[in-house]
């Protein structure tokens, strides 16, 4: 009886165990985790306002850039319309000289009579720049009241032209004579009865005094039209000769001393003999760009030859003495030559007068 109870207990235990195992095998469905949606309204608002702000900034920047570009274009137009120094320097000296030739004659020649003085004033005014406000001093600028003689132009030549901001200053070396009356005391023989006696008498004569000065004439132009912009004035003639030093290029190459040196020197001797005596057409076989003295000078000698070897041949520097064929007056000249050699024959590719 006891055994039966024990057996029934075991059966119940095994039943519960197997039921428990089956329950374990059954997968429990996972509970859905409900996500709470975030509040994105602030993020959207910030993004929208940022976009609006960016657009406003870009529009403002575009307006500023447009204004700046327009300002730069206007400046460029102004600069283009302004006359440059190059434009000012394009004054035709030849045309200006032709214009001034009549003015110089009118200005320099002065006659001591009222009709000539008035005619001179009118003529000179026709050369002047026209002023909107005609001042009294402009009307009187060529008045020569109070003169005591004449002035006569003997000759003139253009001395220099100086460019300025508003005009060009034409400087002419003028030679002229001032004629003026002088009262002198002279002795004269007069009859005194049967005898003659010397008496002193005052007479008026015209004296001449020659002068050389620089006549400075300010000139303005508009294209090929010219006008004198101010009253001319005189200055002393200055020396155009200047103390100008020229620094020559220092030669650092070694002179050629090879086996062809004597042949090159012999060629130079022959070349300059032909250069002095032959016609230009005859020099074709000796040089690329033919030139010649065609017998106007006689060849003397080649002096101080310096030869340098180059990739294409030789570069030669030399001094050559020619002379006048009528009286042997020497004429010295310096040359540089680029020489090439072909089959033992030398040829001048380039000749330069130094």
Curated annotation (Swiss-Prot):
TM regions (residue ranges): 43-63
Record GO cellular component, one term: plasma membrane
Keywords on record: Cell membrane, Membrane, Transmembrane, Transmembrane helix
Gene3D superfamilies: 3.10.450.540
Subcellular location: Cell membrane
Principal place of residence: membrane
Membrane topology annotation: Single-pass membrane protein
Protein's recorded name: Uncharacterized protein YddB
Organism: Bacillus subtilis (strain 168)
Gene responsible for this protein: yddB
């Amino acid at each position: 009886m006891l055994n039966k109870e024990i057996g029934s207990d075991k059966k119940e235990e095994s039943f519960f165990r197997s039921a428990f195992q089956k329950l374990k095998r059954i997968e429990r469905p996972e509970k859905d985790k409900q996500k709470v949606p975030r509040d994105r309204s602030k993020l959207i608002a910030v993004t929208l306002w940022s976009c609006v702000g960016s657009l406003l900034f870009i529009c403002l920047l575009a307006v500023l850039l447009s204004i700046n570009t327009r300002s730069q274009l206007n400046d460029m137009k102004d600069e283009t319309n302004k006359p440059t120094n190059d434009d000012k320097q394009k004054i035709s000296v030849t045309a200006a000289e032709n214009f001034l030739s009549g003015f110089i004659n009118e200005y320099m020649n002065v006659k001591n009579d009222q009709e000539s003085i008035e005619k001179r004033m009118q003529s000179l005014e026709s050369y002047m720049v026209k002023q909107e406000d005609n001042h009294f001093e402009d009307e009187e600028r060529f008045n020569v009241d109070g003169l005591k003689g004449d002035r006569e132009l003997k000759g003139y030549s253009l001395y220099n032209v100086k460019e300025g901001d508003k005009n060009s200053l034409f400087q002419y070396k003028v030679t002229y004579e001032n004629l003026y009356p002088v009262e002198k005391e002279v002795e004269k023989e007069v009859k005194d009865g049967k005898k003659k006696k010397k008496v002193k008498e005052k007479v008026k004569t015209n004296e001449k005094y020659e002068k050389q000065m620089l006549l400075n004439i300010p000139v303005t132009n508009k294209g090929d039209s010219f006008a004198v912009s101010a009253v001319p004035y005189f200055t002393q003639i200055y020396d155009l000769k200047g103390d100008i030093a020229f620094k020559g290029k220092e030669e650092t190459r070694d002179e050629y001393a090879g086996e062809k040196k004597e042949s090159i020197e012999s060629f130079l001797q022959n070349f300059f003999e032909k250069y002095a005596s032959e016609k230009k057409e005859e020099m074709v076989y000796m040089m690329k760009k033919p030139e010649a003295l065609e017998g106007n000078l006689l060849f003397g000698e080649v002096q101080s030859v310096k030869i340098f070897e180059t990739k294409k041949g030789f570069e030669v520097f030399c001094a050559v003495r020619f002379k006048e064929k009528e009286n042997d007056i020497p004429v010295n000249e310096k040359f540089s030559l680029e020489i090439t050699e072909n089959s033992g024959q030398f040829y001048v590719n380039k000749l330069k007068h130094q």
